[in-house]
Amino acid sequence: MENLIEEILKQIGEDPNREGLVKTPNRVKKAYDFLTSGYKADINQLVNGAIFEENTTGMVLVRDIEMYSLCEHHLLPFYGRAHVAYIPNKKIIGISKIPRIVDVFARRLQVQERLTDQIAQAIQETLDPLGVGVVIKAKHLCMMMRGVEKQNSELFTSSLLGLFKTDPTTRSEFLDLIRTGSH
């Protein structure tokens, strides 16, 4: 990958041997390795048995999970917050695992719509809950830095499964909870 980054530098008219750019190909490689580390992650290994029998029936919500990803169309970042909730079906998951699941899918080349669905589906497959709700609000640098150059636009996406999709009361509770004091 480093040779390719060096070639990009040459193609845009830069000197890859210039003092400030000598280590850039290696730095970019390391950055992309980290930013795309979700391809190498395994959800079952990540959860690592942190699923517990519990008879609770109330909604479980982790709100305002900071996330960032790379737009697959321009390789530019998008960033924002994810809100992830589920209704337990005799099982709960360690709460730190939910942001980790968000990171697994965010650390891939993405579109926000698919990212939202993948997070919801992973929670559904891992826990078999009565329902899952995921909402992501993000700013896309591909819209801010190029193209339409809209600095204040935000994209909202949602994925609703089970009770979140079929039961208006569950859906309303979820949306009310993420609105209250949300960033």
UniProtKB/Swiss-Prot annotation:
Q: Does the keyword Acyltransferase apply?
A: no
Q: Can the keyword Iron-sulfur be found in this entry's annotation?
A: no
Q: Which SUPFAM superfamilies match?
A: Tetrahydrobiopterin biosynthesis enzymes-like
List residues binding Zn(2+). C71, H74, C142
NCBIfam families the record matches: folE (TIGR00063), PRK09347.1-2 (NF006825), PRK09347.1-3 (NF006826)
Q: Which family does it belong to?
A: Belongs to the GTP cyclohydrolase I family.
Protein name in the entry = GTP cyclohydrolase 1
Which species expresses this protein natively?
Leptospira biflexa serovar Patoc (strain Patoc 1 / ATCC 23582 / Paris)
Q: Which gene encodes it?
A: folE
